[in-house]
Amino acid sequence: GKRLRPMLTLACARMCGYEGADHVKLAATVEFIHTATLLHDDVVDESAQRRGRPTANLLWDNKSSVLVGDYLFARAFQLMVEPGDLRVLDILSNAAATIAEGEVLQLSAAQNLATDEAVYLQVIRGKTAALFSAATEVGGVIAGRPEEEIKALFDFGDALGVAFQMVDDLLDYWGSEATGKNVGDDFRERKLTLPVIKAVAQADAEERAFWKRTIEKGRQEDGDLAQALALLEPSLDGLARAAGALRDALLQVHCQAFVALAVVGAVVRRNRDDVFVVGILLPRPLQPGADDAEADGQDVGVGQAQLRDHAL
């Protein structure tokens, strides 16, 4: 894995001037929570591959995966109380609960073509962005920063988490082995992610019947994934533009976070290396036609290579 979430905790704490060692324990806590949810998710989804490798439940069994996930959750709670900060405990324990709530909401919304973008955003804010925002927020809390700075760090983590999950869902249809994605898993698991939600909203009667058969009723046949990709392709440019717009919003939140930190002037200057670490975690903008345009410079849309490049 990429260890993005614990890296955020470490970098944000140092960026805020923290000089102790408890941020390492909190970073480990964040990663333990994340890994535990992955182990449980793979059991729920009956997944056979993650990050291009066989899942634990495939290599061993569901019982082992669930028990190891439970152990990691328990260790996470042991670690999060060690700094002796009740607010840190509140943030991380709430994040763990919110992740579970997000997964339950996703399960209840699955296979339901009535699921819209508002529900989708609620799901990804729960199951993904909650841990990103907790990871950045505790960095400011443990450093004893003012409330406006802590709020800015929370907003930054929330926006980054939403962007991360949106791009991850795009890559499930337009990714490759290089991104560690097993293309089509969400389709086979009948998940209503943003690409399908967009396609269903624009579908005619015949296309809607296809999505109803494959997603709602689960009657999938050979060639259905290829047909799904063909139906999704017209919305690719719009989805990429949406991701680019989200990235712009994320950059704005990023700047707001650093403006808040700059209230203390010397903090950002003294910890500029950690500011850089946080900055490079941002996805690059999606530019229409960058890898598909012909020599004459014609804008012919956003290509799959760009989406692969945005895997975090």
Predicted regions and their residues:
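Short C-terminal domain-edge/linker segments immediately following a structured domain
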Residues: 67-69, 309-312
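Glycine-rich loops and low-complexity Gly/Arg-rich segments
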Residues: 63, 92, 266, 302-303
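Sequence-pattern detector for short linear motifs
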Residues: 78, 130, 191-193, 244, ...
